[in-house]
Structures are given as C-alpha cells and as structure tokens.
Amino acid sequence: MTQTSQLLTLGNGSHALVAGSGTPVVLVPGWPESARAYDEVLPFLAARHHVLAVDPPGLGDSVESTQGYDTGSISRQLEDAVRSFMPQPIHLVSHDVGAWIAYAWAAQFPERIRSLTLLDSALPGLAPLQSFPLPPEVNVKLWQLCFNTLPELPEVLTQGRERELFEWLFQHKAQHPKRITQAKRDHYVECYSKPGAMSRGFAYYRDTAKSALQNIEFAKTKLEMPVLALGGEIGMGDRLLKSMELLAVHVEGGSIEDCGHYVMEEQPEVVSSRLLEFFERVESAQS
C-alpha cells in the first residue's frame, strides 16, 4: 500500500508528515526516533483518515523547546500547534516518550482528544516501581531511563557514537530489529548527530521528575475518552493495559505477539489493523 505524505512545519517549528483525508489522526513518536517511525503505518491510516505524524519539540527534525521538556509543557506546545492545523477533535496515537506527551495532552485537553492510543511505554510517576537490582532481562530494556537523566555524561559518551548507541537499542529492544530499515536508521542518526540534538533528547529524561509530579496530579481525574493500550510481547506486554486501567474509564488493549518495543516498525500491519478498528468503533459510538 502506498500513500504519499508531504512535509509540513507547524507554527511552533515542529516538523511533521501529513497524508490522507477524513477524520484527523495525530501520531507522536518517541526517542531516538522521529515521525518516520510511523512510515509503515501511515499509508494504512491515511487511506481513511487525515494523518499528521509530528516530531515533538527537540526530537527528530523539530526545533528545540523554549519552555522546557516536561511533558505537561511539551503537550501544551503541541496542542497549540496542532489545533491551528486540525481544529477538530483528534485520534491521538503515541509511542515511547511520545506516550508520555500524549497522556499529559489528553489529561489537559480532554475535549480535544477523540481517542487516545499508547504504544509500548511506561508513564513517569505512574509505572510500577522497580527494585534494585533489576533482573538482567529488565535492565537491558530500562537502563537508559536512568542513564539519560545524568548530567553531561551521556553527551560525553555518545558524541560521535550515536549510530553505535541506536544500533544497540534496536538490537536489544526489538524482537525483529531487521524490520527497522537501514534507511530509517540512517535518518535517525542524521537527526541526532546535529549539534545539541542528543542533549535535547536527553532533556526529556532529565525532566521526568517534573513530568512524574504532573502525572500524579493528572491521575487524580480518570481519562474519559476511549483508550487503547498496546505493548510489544517482549516489551511492555499487557502491563501498559493494566497500568492504564487505573488511569482511564474506558480502556482496552493488551499485548502484540511476536513483537518488541518498536511496535510500529516490527508489526505495522497488526498495529494498523488494531488502530483502524478502534477508530471505527469510537466514531460509530460517538456519532
């Protein structure tokens, strides 16, 4: 399936890909990826919907945030930018750090979110606490959550070695790393090899303490829009669903079989099918 996307720069300087027509869908990627993480999913969605895949401030090809990297602030920046392009309520889809942003977005602007989808992520302040020492199979998936928060050291160790870091992450966090194409790997390295780009990505992790406090406050009111929570079988599995059942009224989801963390790239047809079926039911119920 092919669907041509066009490049777009939103009012806040965020880089985006846009395709299709119909009810609006916004796709938010995580780190160390970009809007292109949705390349394989976007054609399926754009056949029925008006789709915007956007790089959050400081990630991918977007400009830096001028208001910090806590997800409460980032989500407000994206809401302001997206609202001018898509004034109607949106289906919001998110992955990894993008899900941190999307949860805060939905909590602050519930009237704007027609449905919320979270893909393989653990929300700061709301995910179950881990005890030390972490089991090796857990540590290999989560170590960067602590490493990326450290001052200065991540930049010292990764400058000029962005490719080596990303290749390690893809190899160890994916069930099917080869499904992340070489062209996309090259694109991600190009994005994050630019001056200051890695620091901007690390800033999301360095602000997780602030984001966590915001999330704890947001969680006092359950989300009321339909929520789809999906984890890769060797990633979050059904733990994301169980977590979201405490945070939202109408939740469904589970685990994507034969899949790791990078769900859109590893199992694009499964993810697309689940999303389209979910959107259709939501729209039918709301019509």
Q: Which stretches of residues belong to each language-model region?
A:
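Short beta-strand element of the alpha/beta-hydrolase
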Residues: 23-29
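The serine-hydrolase catalytic nucleophile loop
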Residues: 31-40
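Conserved phosphate-coordination/catalytic loops
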Residues: 32, 72, 266-269
